[in-house]
UniProtKB/Swiss-Prot annotation:
Cited SUPFAM superfamilies: Anticodon-binding domain of a subclass of class I aminoacyl-tRNA synthetases, Nucleotidylyl transferase, ValRS/IleRS/LeuRS editing domain
EC number: 6.1.1.4
Catalytic activity: tRNA(Leu) + L-leucine + ATP = L-leucyl-tRNA(Leu) + AMP + diphosphate
UniProt enzyme class: ligase
Binding site for ATP: 572
Residue ranges of the motif 'KMSKS' region: 569-573
Name of the gene encoding the protein in the UniProt record: leuS
Name of this chain's protein: Leucine--tRNA ligase
Gene3D superfamilies documented for this protein: 3.10.20.590, HUPs, Isoleucyl-tRNA Synthetase, Domain 1
Predominant location: cytoplasm
UniProt subcellular location: Cytoplasm
GO cellular component: a single term: cytosol
Length: 796
């Protein structure tokens, strides 16, 4: 080919940078459009083709919106604190600050190679003090509002990583990072009270343009349940405990109680003969993660030797412990109704505990709705009636109360690692307090020894000079845990709008103009982690009066994974990783961008097909030859278009416009391929067709579009040239296919002119074999004809 993509791609990247083509306007009368990609962890392994699939959709939309009159903010930065960077530093012996900076430089270079239209003047990194100063500032807001607190809680402890992990960081009993075993141990931790926002987080999902599966994922994670909190007495003792149930109507079916092994009453109520068995069971449970306990199929447990008193009947009910009951959920104790709960039924069957039916059914366990039996004053009622009557009875007799509960737990927010934001908290003998705002940022000290300790003590605890804090003559001790990686990413979208502000995390004017994010693109794996945490922090900032919108991301789109050629997830261990730099060298950045867009729907996983990118490269070469010959000379002409080509050009502009708006990029490229084929068939190289083709190609293959735009003497940058308009009258079809009915029964179809008369339609219908067979030699007695829609011939 006459055009060398290596040369012109670098050329246009420089021209865009020199022209500051993609910098968002600080003040503008244009409507705003904030397109954001989830920023990457700057890992030493660099970016792979999957990252390109993440950033291409947002860039296509950004480029499209920019040339349609929007003031576009499309920034990029780095989620630079956290476990991945620190683990790599420990493995290599190089400080994480050094490895992270090197990785960021590598990421930036790769992203620029592919022509993403990021506003690089707004680049951020969460590990920079001028950024995490404001992460600490927001934490202080949480602390001041009582939403950040310390508490000894059972936590997910990873011995290999030597830190605690949040629930969303544990997958199948192992750490998300590295796949190391995780156990449950009690530790004093910082927690964020996300549970205070459970109802708002749940209800406000309805106003978001998000994939339904993601919204449903958050609904399930929040897990709202309406029911009753019922008080049980320990038989023969003064102690009481509570259970939460969504089925108070089944209270008469309770035949045993189960407590979590960690329940504070367990050791107190356990009888002497059962003490050893209970102690051993508690020790065994401590070795299991929460996920293991939920996933276990075989029910295990131990009888405590104690009994509860049924609050209505007064019956004695055995109290057991079992690891399928979690202290973190509900009250840490359950009333077991084995006749109507499969899990309780399995437990009762295994340990020969009585089973009682309180719902009419022919089989047990029966978990559906039926008429109440064996339930005294509830007998004969349906579920709704029985629940209402039982709730009234419990409240009138002070045995229980109505209650709403959530599965959502408070966010475990501290890590016993080095590479993270220091907490702006100092502990004194008489209590803890936040540092004054004018002392922010609390700088993460540079230390040589940053390896985590086996004891669970954070590495910063070994830095005595840093830990010591003087407030006048009062000595305190800095908090030595650090924040999790999710801290910086819970608000980064707000820093982009005003990244150089030294007086505040962002200005009120910038927030009011830019927020919320109009399009957020990222993976569905963040459903119950980052996406939930970002919503929580935004709502807190809204309550603080710092933001005017209580939801950060109005529209969310997920990109599917690019799988290896073998159909498996790309990984170095499988040897199926595709390097974007290699593709850029062999086929060009535009070919990769266009191929990613053409592979299939944005949200679907797609296997890498080497022959596919070859085909896309040929498609781009064919467009090039419509403009220049092999010597690089202009061959595009100024000839008029035939009516057929003119109509197809307008149809293609409309199709690509609509497809970009709906993020159906693969069908947009298909439409351009059809146009290119027709231009070659008609031997048409007119700029009246090729110029708009190049413009609608630009969001996908921006470098080539700029080069061809320049060859055709296009004004200014193609990346900023107004999007081509289409004429709807030229987009209308000349013919239409309509159904033909005889006496209301469909007999076939005809293709006729859009404006065909009734006589023309009837004549065409008579030529259809199935219609003619019914009509014979008769003429219709009545004709019902709606142009372009239906023809019904009535024959007596």
């Amino acid at each position: 080919m006459s055009l060398n993509f290596t040369e012109y791609e670098a050329k246009w990247q420089k021209k865009w940078a020199d022209a500051k083509a993609f910098q968002a306007e600080t003040t503008s009368s244009k409507p705003k459009y904030y397109a954001l990609d989830m920023f990457p962890y700057p890992s030493a392994s660099g970016l792979h083709v999957g990252h390109m699939a993440s950033y291409t959709p947002g860039d296509i939309i950004s480029r499209y919106k920019r040339v349609n009159g929007f003031n576009v903010l499309h920034p990029m930065g780095y989620d630079a604190f956290g476990l991945p960077a620190e683990q790599y530093a420990i493995q290599t012996g190089v400080h994480p600050a050094i490895t992270t900076k090197k990785a960021i430089d590598s990421f930036r270079k790769t992203l620029q190679t592919f022509g993403f239209s990021f506003d690089w003047s707004r680049e951020i990194s969460t590990c920079e003090p001028d950024y995490y100063k404001w992460t600490q500032f927001i934490f202080l807001k949480l602390y001041e509002r009582g939403l950040a607190y310390q508490k000894e809680v059972p936590v997910n402890w990873c011995p290999a990583l030597k830190t605690v992990l949040a629930n969303d960081e544990v997958v199948d009993g192992k750490s998300e990072r590295g796949g190391h075993p995780v156990i449950r141990v009690p530790m004093k931790q910082w927690m964020l009270k996300i549970t205070d926002y459970a109802e708002r987080l749940l209800n406000d999902l309805d106003k978001l343009d998000w994939p339904e599966r993601t919204k449903e994922g958050q609904r399930n994670w929040i897990g709202k349940s309406e029911g009753a909190r019922i008080t049980f007495k320990v038989h023969g003792e003064k102690d009481t405990f509570e259970v939460f149930t969504t089925r108070p109507d089944t209270l008469f079916g309770v035949t045993f109680m189960v407590m979590a092994p960690e329940h504070p009453l367990v050791k107190k109520i356990t009888s002497q003969p059962q003490y050893t068995a209970v102690e051993n069971y508690i020790a065994d449970t401590a070795k299991k993660s929460e996920v293991d306990r939920k996933a276990s199929t075989e029910k295990t447990g131990v009888f405590t030797g104690a009994h509860a008193t049924h609050p209505i009947t007064g019956d004695k009910i055995e109290i057991w412990i079992s690891d399928y009951v979690l202290m973190d959920y509900g009250t840490g104790a359950i009333m077991a109704v084995p006749g109507h709960d499969a899990r309780d039924f399995e437990f009762a069957t295994k340990f020969n505990i009585p089973i009682k039916s309180v719902l009419e059914s022919d089989m047990l366990p029966f978990e559906g709705d039926s008429i109440m039996i064996n339930s005294e004053f509830l007998d004969g009622l349906n579920k709704t009636e029985a629940i209402s009557k039982m709730l009234k009875h419990l409240e009138e007799n002070k045995l229980g109360v109505r209650e709403v509960q959530y599965k959502l737990r408070d966010w475990l927010f501290s890590r016993q690692r080095y590479w993270g934001e220091p907490f702006p908290i100092v502990h004194f003998a008489d209590g803890s307090k936040g540092v004054p705002v004018n002392e922010l940022p609390v700088i993460l000290p540079e230390v040589a020894d940053y390896e985590p300790a086996d004891t669970g003590e954070a590495p910063l605890a070994r830095n005595a000079d840093w830990v010591k804090y003087m407030d006048g003559d009062k000595e305190g001790r800095r908090e030595t845990d650090t924040m999790p990686g999710a801290a910086g990413s819970s608000w980064y979208f707000l820093r982009y709008i005003d990244p150089k502000n030294t007086e505040a995390p962002f200005s009120p004017e910038a927030e009011k103009y830019w927020m919320p994010v109009d399009l957020y693109v990222g993976g569905p794996e963040h459903t119950v982690g980052h996406l939930l945490y970002a919503r929580f922090w935004t709502k807190v900032l809204f309550d603080c009066g710092l933001v005017t919108h209580d939801e950060p991301f109005q529209k969310l789109a997920h990109q599917g994974m690019i799988l290896g050629p073998d159909g498996e997830k790309m990984s170095k261990s499988r040897g199926n990783v595709i390097s974007p730099e290699d593709i850029a060298r062999s086929h060009g950045a535009d070919a990769l961008r266009t191929f990613i867009s053409f592979m299939g729907p944005v949200d679907k996983d797609k296997p890498w097909a080497p022959t596919g990118i070859d085909g896309v490269k040929r498609f781009l070469d064919r467009i090039t030859r419509l403009v220049v010959n092999d010597d690089g000379q202009l061959v595009a002409t100024s000839e008029a278009l035939t009516p057929e080509i003119e109509k197809l050009v307008h149809k293609t502009i409309k199709k690509v416009t609509e497809d970009i708006e709906s993020m159906s990029f693969n069908t947009a490229i298909s439409a351009m391929m059809i146009l290119v084929n027709e231009l070659y068939r008609a031997e048409c190289r007119s700029v009246l067709a090729v110029k708009p083709l190049v413009q609608i190609l630009a969001p996908f293959a921006p470098h080539l579009a700029e080069e061809l735009w320049e060859k055709m003497n296009g004004e200014g940058l193609c990346a900023l040239a107004p999007w081509p308009k289409y004429d709807n009258t030229l987009c209308a079809d000349d013919t239409v296919t309509i159904g033909v009915q005889v006496n209301g029964k469909m007999r076939g179809t005809i293709e006729i002119g859009v404006a065909a008369s009734e006589q023309e339609a009837v004549a065409a219908a008579k030529a259809v074999q199935q219609v003619a067979a019914v009509l014979g030699d008769k003429n219709p007695d009545k004709v019902i004809y709606k142009a372009g829609k239906i023809l019904n011939l009535i024959v007596k």
